[in-house]
C-alpha cells in the first residue's frame, strides 16, 4: 500500500498478531508513482469531464487504465514501464517520455507498417498508362518476418503528404520539388515536373513522370536518389479521421497556475479529417495497432469508429529525443 497508510501499521500488526495466523501477511508501504505533465487527481479529472475539456474518463489524453487502453498502450508496455520505475519509499516523478519509450519498444516489431497520408495532396504521374492499376508487394514489418507481406495498388493518381513537396525548397531538402527525382516507397522512381494551384495559390496537384524500369524502388542503371516518400492510391484509398495527441498539461509552464487551476495545453488534441489510407485499412477493427510509415504508432478508436468511418488515435510519435537512464 502507499505511504499514507504507514501510520496504521501498529494497528495492522496488532490485529495480525492477535489472530495468531500461522503465516501472517506483511504490509509494505511504498511511494505513489507520479508522472510528469499529466493529470492524475480524480478531482481535477472530474472537472475536466464536466467542463467538456475531455470526452470522458477514457479520453486518450488521460492516464487512467481505460484511457491508456483506448489510446493503444499495451499491457506489456505498462508492465515494462513499472519495472523500469521500480519501487521506492522516496517520493519522485517518472518522465512521461519513459512510458512512451516503452510502448515504442513494444510495438516496433509487433505493429504492421502501413502507409497513411495525413495531409494529402494529389500526385499525378503523367506518363503512367491511363486506367492501369498494378499490385506491388510490400513487407508488413522488416523487423518481423512472421508478419509477412501484402499487396498495395499503384496507379496514375496517388496521394502524398503535402509536406513532401516544395516549389522552392531549402538546402538539404531531398523530397519532391521541380526537377528532383525521388523514390516512391516500394514502387518507382519519379521525377517532379511541376504543380497546379487553385485561385488562392494553394497547391492542389503535383505532377511527375516515372521510370518504368525502377519497379521496386531501384534503378537498373545504378543511379541513386536521396529522398524516399510514402504514398497511397488515390482511387482506392480509405478515408479516415486521425487524432494527434500531445500532453494535456503545458510542459513549459508547469502543472498548475497561480490560482491552483490546471495549466492546460490548448494544442493537446489535433483532429485531421481528410486523411487517406491504403485500402488494407478497411479491415481494421477496434484496438488494432499500426505503425503509420514515417508518422508514428496509431490505434483504432473503439468509441467513435463506425462501419465505413475509421478513427485512429496516435499512441506515440515515431521518434523521440528521450534516452533511457542507465
Explain the meaning of each model-derived region:
Residues 1-326:
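Catalytic adenosine-cofactor/nucleotide-binding cores of aminoacyl-tRNA synthetases and other
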Amino acid at each position: 500500500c502507499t505511504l499514507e497508510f504507514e501510520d496504521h501499521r501498529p494497528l495492522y500488526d496488532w490485529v495480525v498478531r492477535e489472530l495468531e495466523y500461522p503465516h501472517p501477511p506483511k504490509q509494505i508501504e511504498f511511494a505513489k508513482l507520479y508522472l510528469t505533465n499529466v493529470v492524475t487527481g480524480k478531482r481535477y479529472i472530474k472537472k475536466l469531464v464536466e467542463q467538456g475539456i475531455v470526452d470522458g474518463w477514457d479520453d486518450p489524453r488521460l492516464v487512467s487504465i481505460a484511457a491508456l487502453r483506448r489510446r493503444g498502450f499495451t499491457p506489456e508496455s505498462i508492465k515494462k514501464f513499472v519495472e523500469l520505475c521500480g519501487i521506492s519509499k522516496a517520493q519522485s516523478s517518472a518522465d512521461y517520455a519513459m512510458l512512451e519509450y516503452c510502448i515504442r519498444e513494444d510495438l516496433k516489431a509487433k505493429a504492421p507498417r502501413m502507409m497513411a497520408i495525413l495531409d494529402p495532396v494529389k500526385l499525378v504521374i503523367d506518363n503512367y498508362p491511363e486506367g492501369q492499376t498494378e499490385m506491388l508487394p510490400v513487407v508488413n514489418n522488416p523487423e518481423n518476418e512472421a508478419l509477412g507481406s501484402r499487396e498495395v495498388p499503384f496507379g496514375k493518381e496517388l496521394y502524398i503528404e503535402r509536406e513532401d513537396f516544395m516549389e522552392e525548397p531549402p538546402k538539404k531538402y531531398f523530397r519532391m520539388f521541380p526537377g528532383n527525382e525521388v523514390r516512391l516507397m516500394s514502387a518507382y522512381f519519379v521525377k517532379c515536373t511541376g504543380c497546379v494551384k487553385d485561385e488562392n495559390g494553394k497547391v492542389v496537384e503535383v505532377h511527375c513522370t516515372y521510370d518504368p524500369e525502377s519497379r521496386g524502388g531501384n534503378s537498373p542503371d545504378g543511379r541513386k536518389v536521396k529522398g524516399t516518400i510514402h504514398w497511397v492510391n488515390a482511387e482506392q484509398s480509405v478515408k479516415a479521421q486521425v487524432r494527434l495527441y500531445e500532453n494535456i498539461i503545458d510542459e513549459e509552464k508547469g502543472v498548475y497556475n497561480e490560482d491552483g487551476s490546471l495549466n492546460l495545453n490548448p494544442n493537446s488534441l489535433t483532429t485531421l479529417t481528410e486523411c487517406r489510407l491504403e485500402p488494407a485499412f478497411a479491415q481494421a477493427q477496434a484496438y488494432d495497432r499500426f505503425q503509420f510509415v514515417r508518422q508514428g504508432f496509431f490505434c483504432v478508436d473503439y468509441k467513435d469508429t463506425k462501419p465505413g468511418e475509421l478513427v485512429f488515435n496516435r499512441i506515440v510519435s515515431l521518434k523521440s529525443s528521450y534516452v533511457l537512464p542507465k
